[in-house]
A protein has these predicted regions:
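Short helix- or helix-capping micro-motifs
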Residues: 128-133, 183, 187
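Extracytoplasmic catalytic/substrate-binding loops of multi-pass membrane glycan-assembly enzymes
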Residues: 45-60, 69-84, 90-95, 148
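Transmembrane-helix motifs of polytopic, lipid-linked glycan transferases
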Residues: 6, 28, 32, 98-119, ...
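Membrane-interface alpha helices of multi-pass inner-membrane proteins
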Residues: 66, 174-191
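Start-transfer (signal-anchor) and selected internal transmembrane alpha helices
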Residues: 3-42, 126
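Short acidic/glycine- and proline-prone juxtamembrane loop motifs at membrane-interface regions
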Residues: 140-151
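Membrane-interface transmembrane helices that cradle and orient dolichyl/undecaprenyl
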Residues: 119, 158-175
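Alpha-helical transmembrane segments of multi-pass membrane proteins
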Residues: 101-105, 133, 149-162, 176-179, ...
């Protein structure tokens, strides 16, 4: 009787572990499906409905043809990333809408990973990203590649690596290096990025 209870208990624990792993895998897959749908829809819709690129994107493309360390309005990263895509894809409008969504999706991935480490719960991680989708700068304004879109992944990466440094209570060279790298690129994306660094 003692052995049968242990056997049943062990089988129940195995089933609970299996069910927990299956749910985690399903949530991970759901997250990947969500970001794929976001990437495809927000690339296709403006590609099919807009007659031309948004004005900020056109302005930054013009800056990209003559890259400097800064311009009268904004730092150079936005023009640099657009110029890279221009060298690869030429004047295909869909490519610039795709670039926007790549930056947004990277931010989603970082937020999902950060929430997963913070909450230790994939459901809350997925909810975090879904709530972020409701924020104005992550949906309707995303087809326009400008400094606001350009800074999104670097903002998320700086918060993530800052948290990792404070959470571990020890200095990790890799985390410090990545924090510095993403902070630098973030500042070169939008000058107001300095507020995050000061905070």
């Amino acid at each position: 009787s003692i052995f049968s209870n242990k056997y049943v208990s062990s089988k129940l624990n195995s089933y609970k572990i299996y069910k927990m792993l299956r749910n985690k895998i399903n949530l991970q897959n759901l997250f990947y499906i969500f970001i794929a749908i976001h990437l495809i829809l927000w690339t296709l819709i403006p590609s099919l409905t807009n007659n031309n690129l948004p004005l900020d994107t056109i302005e930054h493309l013009a800056w990209g043809s003559n890259l400097d360390w800064g311009f009268n309005k904004h730092p150079p990263a936005v023009a640099f990333f657009l110029e890279v895509f221009y060298q690869i894809f030429g004047s295909q409008d869909w490519a610039y809408y795709l670039l926007c969504q790549i930056f947004v999706v990277i931010a989603f991935i970082v937020v999902f990973k950060f929430a997963e480490e913070l909450f230790k719960n994939k459901t809350l991680s997925l909810i975090s990203v879904l709530l972020l989708e409701g924020v104005y700068f992550y949906n309707f304004t995303t087809p326009e590649f400008n400094v606001n879109i350009c800074q999104l992944p670097f903002w998320a990466l700086c918060v993530y690596y800052s948290w990792r440094l404070f959470d571990k209570h020890q200095i990790n060279f890799k985390d410090c290096f990545l924090l510095g790298l993403f902070a630098g690129i973030g500042f070169l994306s939008k000058y107001l990025f300095i507020y995050l660094l000061i905070a």
